[in-house]
């Protein structure tokens, strides 16, 4: 007996998946040369360069809280991703064109706001495209999402350091800028195909609520499901998977 045909993703997913790969290329490409740039071109001691990188990474990890609040209460996920992506591109261009400590500070600030603010919304917005009565398709979506993240990040680790060494920081940092501009363009091209849930105010299954639930119920997390599994006692699987995807992106 022939097996049932495999469910297809909605057309919107192809735009979001390639947007994610390009965004991750831009982020990991930029971070792969950040410390080297601080030491070799700005003349910073290595320990100070590492501290700078750590502060930048901390800002990126903090911004998902802000990005989630903005999306839930004000702009919705679509417009949050769209507008923060413009700042993200501007951050890359600032570092590429303004070769100084001040340029790096401004650029890193814009990138932290863009990357961190988009982080909780990109995977959740992709999940918005999948009907809730198709949980198997949602699981496949997050597998695809993780794959696209790996494609973008792995490609950047080879391409960007090589370009930096061969052509200098302007091309090295300019390449992630082009990648992020491409990510924004792909996202915008698919705009008419997206399901766009409006902002609804604080969600009962929001990012912070799921994390808080996971911490409270960590002892009840199913074996092999990671510490976030405890949140399944209070939240649906799609909400927990959305948060899990954020940490995969990090």
Q: What function would you assign to each model-found segment?
A:
Residues 1-11, 133, 161-250:
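Intracellular loop-helix junctions on the cytosolic face of multi-pass helical membrane proteins
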Residues 1-27:
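Cytosolic juxtamembrane N-terminal segment immediately preceding the first transmembrane helix
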Residues 32-52:
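Short amphipathic helix-loop junctions that connect adjacent transmembrane helices
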Residues 38-39, 70-74, 159-167:
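Interfacial helix-cap and linker-helix signal at transmembrane-aqueous boundaries
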Residues 54-72, 154-156:
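Central cavity-lining transmembrane alpha-helices of secondary-active solute carriers
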Residues 73-86, 133, 137-138:
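Cytoplasmic membrane-interface "Motif A"-like loop-to-helix N-cap segments
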Residues 82-106:
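C-terminal ends and interior cores of transmembrane alpha-helices
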Residues 117-133:
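Intracellular juxtamembrane helix-capping segments at the cytosolic ends
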């Amino acid at each position: 007996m022939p097996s049932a045909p495999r469910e297809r993703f909605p057309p919107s997913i192809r735009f979001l998946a390639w947007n994610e790969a390009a965004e991750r290329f831009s982020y990991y490409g930029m971070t792969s040369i950040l410390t080297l740039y601080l030491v070799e071109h700005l003349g910073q001691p290595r320990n100070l360069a590492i501290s700078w990188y750590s502060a930048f990474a901390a800002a990126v990890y903090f911004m998902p809280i802000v990005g989630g609040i903005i999306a839930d209460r004000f702009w919705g996920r679509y417009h949050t991703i769209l507008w923060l992506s413009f700042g993200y591109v501007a951050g890359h261009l600032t570092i590429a064109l303004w070769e100084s400590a001040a340029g790096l500070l401004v650029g890193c600030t814009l990138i932290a706001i863009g990357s961190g603010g988009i982080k909780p919304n990109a995977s959740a917005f992709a999940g918005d495209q999948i009907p809730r009565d198709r949980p198997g398709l949602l699981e496949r979506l997050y597998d695809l999402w993780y794959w696209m993240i790996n494609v973008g990040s792995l490609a950047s680790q080879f391409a960007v350091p090589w370009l930096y060494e061969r052509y200098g920081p302007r091309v090295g940092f300019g390449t992630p800028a082009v990648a992020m501009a491409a990510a924004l363009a792909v996202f915008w091209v698919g705009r008419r195909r997206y399901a766009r849930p409006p902002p609804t105010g604080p969600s009962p299954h929001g990012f912070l609520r799921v994390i808080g639930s996971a911490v409270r119920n960590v002892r009840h997390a199913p074996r092999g499901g990671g510490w976030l599994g405890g949140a399944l006692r209070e939240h649906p699987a799609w909400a927990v998977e959305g948060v899990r995807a954020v940490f995969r992106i990090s």
